[in-house]
Amino acid sequence: MEEEEKKPSKAKEIWSYIGGSIMIFMFFVGIYLMTYYHSVDVEAYLSDRGQVKVEKFDYGIFYDGPGESEAMIFYPGARVATNAYAPLMQEFAENGIDCFLIDMPFHMAFIGKHFAGNVQEDYDYDTWYFGGHSLGGAMIADYAASHIEDVDGLLLLAAYPTKDLSDTDISAVTIYGSEDGILNMNKVVEGRDLLPEKSVEICIEGGNHARFGSYGEQKGDGQATISGEEQRRQTVEAFLKYK
């Protein structure tokens, strides 16, 4: 008489299903993280230009301009190429604020949220600003909240804080475009109560979400009515005025 074929236990079936589901999930997460917005027309801003020297360092790209006392550490937006912010960093450096543009693992600022501290360990400036775009802005504001003694001011581009900074004496400049289709304005309004007393909020008329960087159009964003160059110019001008 033939022996009955043994059937896999219910528990093994469940664990096999779970394992397969996890592998599929991780596959799509990997695809998501590896798919990002590439920079557009930034080559001229990746090498020395005028008074600004550009060089790579351990955590990204350093823009060393004519200024000597002020510097900004800048976190890019989620899934955006680091060098898409090269034109903006160049303009800040030309105006006396050296910039450290941080290269995030998988283009996600929450993974390298602590990198600002690493930069500050290696460089010495009298005044430090923390800046970022979108998720990068939220993450560097988060880092600032727990390292408030290391920062003098914040620049939040299409971003808002998630931790309380209201009792601090740092400055904060929030800037977004009137045509931004990505930014959650309800969160911006809620975030106002978390910002320090020395805060200003500026809306760039005609600007959108993507044109703080140079990476083309972003899915879901509004249609800008000003150029990226003009949006960056107004951004730098506003920060220099209110920092």
Feature map (PLM): residue ranges:
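Hydrophobic membrane-insertion alpha-helices, especially the h-region
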Residues: 15-33
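Conserved alpha/beta-hydrolase fold motif
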Residues: 130-131, 154
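Gly/Ala-rich beta-loop-alpha elbow adjacent to hydrolase catalytic centers
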Residues: 131-140
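Short beta-strand/loop motif that positions the catalytic acidic residue
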Residues: 168, 174-176
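Active-site-adjacent alpha-helix of alpha/beta-hydrolase-fold enzymes
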Residues: 176-230
